[in-house]
Amino acid sequence: LIILLGGVTVNFILGFFLYMMIMFVWGKTVVTEDNLNSGFKVSEVMQKVGFNDGDKIISVDGKELVDQFEINKMLFTRNISEVQVLSENGERKIINIPENIGTKMMESGQMLSFIPVPDLVIDSILPNMPASFAGLQKGDIISRVNGSKIYGDDDFENSKSVNADYMELEILRGGSLFDLTIPFDSSEKIVGMNIKNQMIKLTKLEYGFFDSLAVGFDYGYWTLYDYVSQFKYVFTKAGASQLGGFGTIGKIFPASWDWQRFWETTALLSIILAFMNLLPIPALDGGHVMFVLYEMLSGRKPSDKFMEYATGIGFFLLIALFLYANGMDVILSLIHI
């Protein structure tokens, strides 16, 4: 039994060890609540649950959420029951999460149900145009247009159409809010300014050697947990359509060489291989372990004929899965041509 589990054990150890060393060498980059000035743009599925555009995540099941980006993964895989949010108006509220939220995310195709909203910043002002006459300056952050909170370029363009002759802006400059009214220069509603999305600030967490061991182990544990939790979706129609083979694995690696990304991907694949090899499918280590445990508990060894048939069936299942996964790669690549 120890020999049969040797390869699986080495893969698990390698994956966890790599995550520990990654935390020690590079640390971890997160997006904190303070980094998200405008909160999240929330999907329709999450709006039905009770979330709203502009929400920030404070805690999940009573524990502070350090990395705001984690919320999508946690909702999908970790069976959380409640989320505390800070609304755009400053109100704190607790939202109860339905048990089937992961299935709803999968079926709707809204896996990224929380998309961080970058600040909309004025990049340049054209001279002798309505924007310059109104007093707008480069670097001003647009908060509201015609009374509506802005969550990206689309909201900005849609809000311009509310009034026919002018646009009311609430801007943030130097920590203070200003209200400005800009008349349109023509029927095309030209105001003479260029806007851009400001990059969301990241916070880097660095760890000493011993701290990195604990943080890396925790990261590896949750990586394994999330992967195992996602496995149940493979047997759904939506999940089966997203299976992939070598092409999908290749896309995990970055287009240009990056040592951190390389080792992160290697650690992930090591943990995935360890889990997959433990599945009770004949021809895999997990299948052999299953038969050995049966022999140990019953005192009877399965017949050679039975083992031959079982191994053949297991091999057939693996080949079928291999062909299906790589076939999906081909189909998806043709669709996106």
Indicate residue ranges for each PLM-predicted region.
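Alpha-helical transmembrane segments of multi-pass membrane proteins
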Residues: 11, 269-278, 318-325
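Terminal peptide-recognition signature
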Residues: 7, 46, 54-57, 83, ...
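Membrane-interfacial segments
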Residues: 22-34, 283, 298, 330-334
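PDZ/PDZ-like domain segments forming the peptide/carboxylate-binding groove
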Residues: 25-66, 106-144, 148-151
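Functional transmembrane alpha-helices
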Residues: 109-133, 141-143, 148-149, 153-275, ...
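Internal alpha-helical transmembrane segments
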Residues: 1-43, 306-315, 320-322
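Interdomain regulatory linker/hinge segments that flank or connect interaction modules
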Residues: 1-18, 60-105, 226
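Membrane-helix cytosolic exit motif
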Residues: 18, 322-333
